Amino acid sequence: MVELKTIGLFLITAVAEIVGCYLPYLWLTQGRSVWLLLPAGLSLVLFAWLLSLHPTAAGRVYAAYGGVYIFVAILWLWLVDGIRPTLWDLVGSLVALFGMAIIMFAPRPA
């Protein structure tokens, strides 16, 4: 059960980070409202707070989170940007998820 909670938390964290970066991107590149920076900032604060909820060393969390971030970014590419991922995008994201699983769930000495 801890594994599902960890993965779920990583997924929510990745969405918070991507939203926090995507909204300023819209402002800078597409001339959208400067007011997008407010929810972007709040999303990045949420992102940092969510990372703090993991009960393991920060470096391990950041390393493992990167694998989930890659997976969510590929989903974002497809669902938000409307660009279908290539086979290699999918393979790469699965390799990253496998790496995350090794980092987070490998047996460790007590």
Swiss-Prot record:
Keyword Transmembrane: yes
Keywords in alphabetical order: Cell inner membrane, Cell membrane, Membrane, Transmembrane, Transmembrane helix
Location of the protein in the cell: Cell inner membrane
Keyword Magnesium attributed: no
Any one GO cellular component localisation term in the record: plasma membrane
UniProt topology in membrane: Multi-pass membrane protein
A Pfam family the protein falls into: UPF0060
PANTHER family: UPF0060 MEMBRANE PROTEIN YNFA
Family listed: Belongs to the UPF0060 family.
Descriptive protein name: UPF0060 membrane protein ASA_2267
Species the sequence originates in: Aeromonas salmonicida (strain A449)
